[in-house]
A protein has these predicted regions:
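Amphipathic alpha-helical interaction surfaces in cytosolic regulatory modules
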Residues: 28-117
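Short acidic-hydrophobic, aromatic-tinged amphipathic segments that line or gate anion-handling sites
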Residues: 118-124
Length: 134
């Protein structure tokens, strides 16, 4: 079982987007590593986060749990209230998105219900350009 490696970068589009590039295998022992990196980006003022899944080998329940916690971290309280008020309407986060999952990881995200709230892109350019600060 390989470890999870995380590198970080920022790209300036319409807004500054922090990208966490993941490679390897997120599991119970590395879940906090991913959460800590996302939390550090958030505390450093990042409002927009993109997870690059292109080098991720597998997505376990620990990885899904981490993605869910990061979604909550980057979703403002005002949006949470909108989600609860309009629970029958899908909410797509403008603050947290995913890019380049393998077909297997996309399938896991789909059956876990993550596609209802998190936008997923097939290439980095489209993903970065989707953040617009509205």
């Amino acid at each position: 079982m390989s470890e999870l490696n995380i590198t970080s970068s920022q790209i300036q589009g319409d807004v500054t987007v922090t990208i966490l590039h993941l490679s390897g295998h997120p599991h119970g022992n590395t879940e906090n590593q991913l959460l800590d990196r996302a939390r550090q980006a958030y505390e450093d003022g990042s409002k927009y986060l993109l997870l690059d899944l292109s080098e991720l080998e597998i997505l376990t329940s620990a990885g899904l749990r981490a993605i869910h916690k990061i979604f909550n971290m980057f979703t403002p309280q005002s949006d949470v209230e909108i989600i609860h008020q309009h629970s029958t309407e899908p909410y797509k986060s403008p603050y947290f998105k995913l890019v380049c999952p393998s077909p297997e990881i996309y399938y896991v995200l789909n059956i876990a219900g993550f596609l209802q709230n998190i936008l997923i892109y097939n290439n980095m350019e489209d993903a970065v350009n989707s953040f617009n600060g509205d």
